[in-house]
Amino acid sequence: MAKIKARDLRGKKKEELLKHVDDLKVELSQLRVAKVTGGAASKLSKIRVVRKSIARVLTVINQTQKENLRKFYKGKKYKPLDLRPRKTRAIRRQLTKHEQGLMTKKMQRRSRLYSMRKFAVKA
């Protein structure tokens, strides 16, 4: 089997991709048997190509799965941890902009009664 391109795989359904992976795995096992029994050099070099092809198909499956999950959870309040943006622990614990702007009743009263003084500079 020739080297496959990821862009060719993206349009296919998951069942087709899984069947493709199974076919590639069967081919890989045949190539490994040929390696043990002393097969041709062309077959030995093909092992690497087939392994990479399997990885490529599985990568496309995982990417499409994650993309569908992102669409499903878009706009929802809670998301799975692996779909949330990656941040450090300290950043996750910071106050939000809204929380930073909140004031107690006492602070609101104080800012209303004693607002910031404005001075005019006489030139």
UniProtKB/Swiss-Prot annotation:
Where does the record say this protein resides?
Cytoplasm
Q: Which InterPro entries match?
A: Ribosomal_uL29, Ribosomal_uL29_CS, Ribosomal_uL29_euk, Ribosomal_uL29_sf
Listed under subunit, the entry gives: Component of the large ribosomal subunit.
**What gene name is listed for this protein?**
rpl35
Q: Which terms in the GO cellular component ontology are assigned?
A: cytosolic large ribosomal subunit
Which GO molecular function annotation, any one, does this entry have?
structural constituent of ribosome
Q: What is this protein called?
A: Large ribosomal subunit protein uL29
One Gene Ontology BP term is: translation
Keywords (A to Z) from UniProt: Cytoplasm, Ribonucleoprotein, Ribosomal protein
Q: What is the purpose of this protein?
A: Component of the large ribosomal subunit. The ribosome is a large ribonucleoprotein complex responsible for the synthesis of proteins in the cell.
Query: Of which family is this protein a member?
Result: Belongs to the universal ribosomal protein uL29 family.
Record keyword Cytoplasm present: yes
